[in-house]
Regions:
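Outer membrane beta-barrel
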Residues: 23-172, 180-198, 337, 342-347, ...
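Outer-membrane beta-barrel pore domains
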Residues: 47-48, 94, 200-210, 215-233, ...
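N-terminal low-complexity, intrinsically disordered patches enriched in charged
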Residues: 18-20, 118, 316
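Short helix-to-loop capping/linker segments positioned immediately adjacent to catalytic or ligand/cofactor-binding
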Residues: 174-178, 192, 274-276, 294-295
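Gram-negative bacterial Sec-dependent N-terminal signal peptides
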Residues: 1-22
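A short secondary-structure junction signal
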Residues: 161-163, 173-178, 216-219, 319
Length: 430
């Protein structure tokens, strides 16, 4: 099957790859698809969705159909297991226009945000077991939300898209906000892509996500008050430290030095796997993807190289004596950032192998002293996958982590995963 994209065909193919326009089905005969994801894992990642031992991954049931010649609708539900419990989540529930003029398209409801390269793709299409550390930290693995999206694809030979999203923002909300904005997230993005000859294609994107509810409050005077309190009540302080301040902070922290659990999204009041661990006022993203397939034919062998960089600005609003200011805190950075680079090579129709390296630089709160400590992740991963068909994959992956402050995780992780798709399934995105 040839995957060659020429000129405007690249733009058309990019649109056809979206779930709203690919294999639309009908009201009397809707598309129904089921994705089964299971695994065994030795070890755990910080902010990861997969726990040690046997478990269910991103098991997905989706219904989609064209409502008429003007609208398309889709519902995607996800089953996941965490801490011995199984939860049912609604990941997508949206309608999208099919016939707006001038290359415009409108989507409304709950959907995956189009920030970056990976986020708007379903988890079962990933080449690795979990998303990179920067995705787990800043987007809660994959960011979906309630809102609207308007995008425009230019009628040009070079694929060019502009888009805007307005979203509720609850999964990206900072902890401790008293009166958050109802509409919290505004996102602008652009994508550019094309072909180089018959065998090469590429896509680049830029995104700016404004999060009105993203800045966590920091109290400057708390540090001095707490030191005074420590000096006067040494024994009480030692007792609190031993028990991890369970009552005050709502943590089940039996190991007071494991700061990696103290700033994750449980503290934000969100589901353990679907809220951002680190938030800020502005999130910037740049991504680039390159694909090679001999003669444009992806069936036998092809190479994909992708990379993204995230910059999270102004993670905190500092309060001193009741006055809130944006600015520098002597104990912590003014911004967090992270990136990854991956390469995946399919060397015959049934086998592929890949390497990925990524880093995250952030800060975690030491609750006993109200101090910020640098928190870093360096993650190296290698995988090999067997593809009996286009609808199934068995993947073996090794992950090595170099962690700073993220103590509640493992340095070496081995994961064996299966992922199969049943029923109708739309084309994958570029």
């Amino acid at each position: 099957m040839s995957m060659k994209l020429n000129g405007t065909a690249f733009a058309v193919a990019a649109l056809l790859a979206t779930p709203a326009l690919a294999n639309t089905g009908s009201l009397t005969n809707p598309n129904i698809s089921l994705v089964l994801d299971g695994y065994y894992q030795d070890g755990e990642r910080p902010m990861g969705e997969r726990e040690e031992g046997f478990g269910l991954g991103h098991t997905e049931l989706a219904f989609s159909a064209a409502v008429d010649d003007k609208l398309y609708g889709k519902l995607t539900t996800v089953l996941e297991s965490h801490d011995g419990e199984t939860e049912l989540l609604v990941e997508e529930a949206f309608i999208q226009t099919l016939a707006m003029p001038g290359g415009l398209s409108l989507r409304a409801g709950r959907f995956l945000s189009d920030i970056g390269y990976l986020n708007n793709q379903h988890m079962h299409t990933d080449a690795f077991v979990e998303r990179p550390a920067v995705y787990r930290a800043f987007l809660g693995n994959h960011y979906y939300d309630d809102g609207v999206r308007l995008n425009w694809v230019a009628p040009t030979d070079l694929y060019f898209e502009l888009g805007a999203e307005v979203l509720g923002g609850d999964p990206l909300m900072a902890e401790g906000l008293v009166d958050p904005e109802t509409v919290g997230v505004y996102h602008l993005y652009t994508k550019l892509g094309g072909d180089i000859g018959q065998s090469h294609s590429w896509q680049a994107s830029l995104s700016w996500l404004r999060n009105e509810n993203g800045m966590a409050a920091m109290h400057e005077h708390d540090d001095h008050d707490e030191h005074d309190h420590d000096e006067e009540h040494d024994e009480e302080h030692d007792h609190d430290e031993e028990h991890g301040h369970d009552e005050e902070h709502g943590h089940d922290d039996e190991h007071g030095d494991e700061h990696g659990d103290e700033h994750l999204h449980d503290d934000h009041g969100h589901d353990h796997s679907h809220g951002a661990a680190f938030t800020g006022r502005d999130l910037f993203n740049a991504s680039f993807v390159y694909k090679w397939a001999p003669g444009g034919n992806y069936k036998y062998n092809h190479l994909t190289i992708s990379g993204e960089y995230f910059y999270l600005d102004k993670p905190y609003a500092f309060e001193e004596h009741g006055h809130e200011e944006e600015g520098h805190h002597e104990d912590g950075p003014d911004y967090f950032d992270g990136w990854y680079l991956s390469g995946v090579y399919q060397f015959n129709p049934s086998w592929s192998a890949g390497l990925r390296y990524g880093e995250l630089s952030a800060a975690l709160m030491h609750e006993e002293h109200a101090h910020l400590h640098d928190a870093k992740i360096k993650e190296s991963e290698a995988m090999i996958a067997w593809h009996p068909s286009h609808f199934s994959v068995v993947r073996l992956q090794y992950t090595h982590q170099d962690l700073t402050e993220f103590a509640a995780a493992d340095d070496h992780i081995i994961t064996l995963q299966y992922n199969v798709t049943l029923g109708a399934h739309g084309a994958h995105q570029f």
